[in-house]
Amino acid sequence: MLVHLFRVGIRGGPFPGRLLPPLRFQTFSAVRNTWRNGKTGQLHKAEGEYSDGYRSSSLLRAVAHLRSQLWAHLPRAPLAPRWSPSAWCWVGGALLGPMVLSKHPHLCLVALCEAEEAPPASSTPHVVGSRFNWKLFWQFLHPHLLVLGVAVVLALGAALVNVQIPLLLGQLVEVVAKYTRDHVGSFMTESQNLSTHLLILYGVQGLLTFGYLVLLSHVGERMAVDMRRALFSSLLRQDITFFDANKTGQLVSRLTTDVQEFKSSFKLVISQGLRSCTQVAGCLVSLSMLSTRLTLLLMVATPALMGVGTLMGSGLRKLSRQCQEQIARAMGVADEALGNVRTVRAFAMEQREEERYGAELEACRCRAEELGRGIALFQGLSNIAFNCMVLGTLFIGGSLVAGQQLTGGDLMSFLVASQTVQRSMANLSVLFGQVVRGLSAGARVFEYMALNPCIPLSGGCCVPKEQLRGSVTFQNVCFSYPCRPGFEVLKDFTLTLPPGKIVALVGQSGGGKTTVASLLERFYDPTAGVVMLDGRDLRTLDPSWLRGQVVGFISQEPVLFGTTIMENIRFGKLEASDEEVYTAAREANAHEFITSFPEGYNTVVGERGTTLSGGQKQRLAIARALIKQPTVLILDEATSALDAESERVVQEALDRASAGRTVLVIAHRLSTVRGAHCIVVMADGRVWEAGTHEELLKKGGLYAELIRRQALDAPRTAAPPPKKPEGPRSHQHKS
């Protein structure tokens, strides 16, 4: 902890030729908000900026100012190579920590080394470094502390029983050594108590082991369920930007593989780690009572082994992290291929997908084998060291027995106890690799739990239903996707959707039409300008209310869930009655084909609705959008992927659904938007021209050119795109 709080310019060691560099006091951001700039977690310097929550004291600022004045006039030596963290970092933290804390308790919140700073404000979620979050871990562990405490007590009891067993075995050996065959009766009498005592200890040990393993399973499984639930909830609450940047396979991997890995490590730490540590400590006490000289041999060898393990740990931890990330990438490739298997089959790309997945698996194998070699090296060295310890014990212990300084029974007890120590430390060495993987997995899980979305799911005001008109205004909106910040999709975009009217957006692909719909749904916030509903900024409204009750969205490729038709329609309004579902289906022209199925509304549609035709899926999507009675309806290429007959049926449903609602239609087929109250032609992220169908044809602008092109391209012959006018035409639309 001190390393994080007091890195004040001393890492990297002293300068050549200087005894100690001057301390560089800087402001310290209490919250380590990191953002992506090439590498996640890299901090940058912002001169003169202070944390909003914590400001340095006037004394600290004066010292910093004086230091900067003196530093400017001092001769400077070249900087030594910087290591992070270095030995000087540890020394400085240890020496300065108590002193600074005693002088000013808030200095730990306002000191930052020269190379670090607070980042500027960003609209993208902050991704923290992949470090194990002990605070989050405590939140999951806290509800189970009582059960865990009982399990720990039972594990400690089992360990203490194991400590007593070597002593009793030594006493039994003493009895065996004292008597010969002529003293059978006395031997049986004296050994009976020891044997009975040993049997009782073995039974108690078995019961204690059973108890703590059952309780650990109870705690571990419940923690895993809580973690998966919290992680899934956190993922669902992330911005759409987050899902643009992360593959589904990697997210699923964290929900399954990483949580399982962490749970296994947690259970092993208690069941084997705590027990082994207790046995090592208890046996060392027993060993010191039996023979101080032999115990010193173990005490000298043990720190050396721990030092080697610590040095190897950092490298193995990094390898484990890389291995898990590679597994997630492989799962992402598999998920993508299997999720789009129809497209893969249509293009006969099975071989290519196999090669892609095979390449990722090969990378997984290489990293896993490298990690395995590292763990094997560690365990091999540990076994060699432990066996050498046993050999040394036999050699020195035998000489002590020969010199009458140690009895045979004590040597037997020492050997059994040392074997217990050896076995426990071997378990710890095996546990080391598992703990490394578990900490890495836990860090990956907690990393996503700690993310805070820029657009919350709820919070803000709601407009009463009777006061909601449905007027939508885009005022001087500029927007760039966070994954492509240098490319503006919308540029000074201004548009008004009058209440109860149909406004159609047309234009070439890439003009920003779908982006307009995404901003209206508030999947993203504009980088400049404002989007308003009835004169209220969308950012002041409750997003959950906006999406759940006000805006209905029907896309070109509707996504259905692998459940019944009834549940798919009810997805738009969970509390809807069966009669409301039937009404929405009739309004969407879906009731007839649904009732033609043997199971009717209880028909399971299959994954993504694969058992239904395109027109049937689209009508179910319309019913799902209409069941919540939205005030604003978005139709994004809702009929472009359908055949003529399906398009006719779906268009009838859309016309019926549009009555009395504010409708935003995005279309490529211009024939479907001729009846719109206003047709807006978009080009280069701007409104190029607007008006009714007849008005735009009379203007002879871009819309008229698009109409002519579509008439010529009816046979689907290739043709170059139409030329853009030299500039947008002035227009006024009367609602």
UniProtKB/Swiss-Prot annotation:
Q: Where are the transmembrane segments?
A: 145-165, 196-216, 296-316
What region holds the ABC transmembrane type-1 domain?
A: 150-437
Tissue specificity statement from the Swiss-Prot or TrEMBL entry: Ubiquitous.
Q: Which SMART domains match?
A: AAA
Q: Where the protein is mainly located, per its record? A: mitochondrion
Q: What activates or inhibits this protein?
A: Channel activity inhibited by ATP via ABCB8/MITOSUR subunit.
Give the residues the record marks as binding ATP: 507-514
Q: Which UniProt keywords apply?
A: ATP-binding, Ion transport, Membrane, Mitochondrion, Mitochondrion inner membrane, Nucleotide-binding, Potassium, Potassium transport, Transit peptide, Transmembrane, Transmembrane helix, Transport
The UniProt GO MF terms for this protein read:
ABC-type transporter activity; ATP binding; ATP hydrolysis activity; ATPase-coupled transmembrane transporter activity
Record's function text: ATP-binding subunit of the mitochondrial ATP-gated potassium channel (mitoK(ATP)). Together with pore-forming subunit CCDC51/MITOK of the mitoK(ATP) channel, mediates ATP-dependent potassium currents across the mitochondrial inner membrane. An increase in ATP intracellular levels closes the channel, inhibiting K(+) transport, whereas a decrease in ATP levels enhances K(+) uptake in the mitochondrial matrix. Plays a role in mitochondrial iron transport.
Task: List the protein's name.
Answer: Mitochondrial potassium channel ATP-binding subunit
Organism source for this protein? Answer: Homo sapiens (Human)
Upper classification of the source organism reads: Eukaryota, Metazoa, Chordata, Craniata, Vertebrata
Q: Which gene encodes it?
A: ABCB8
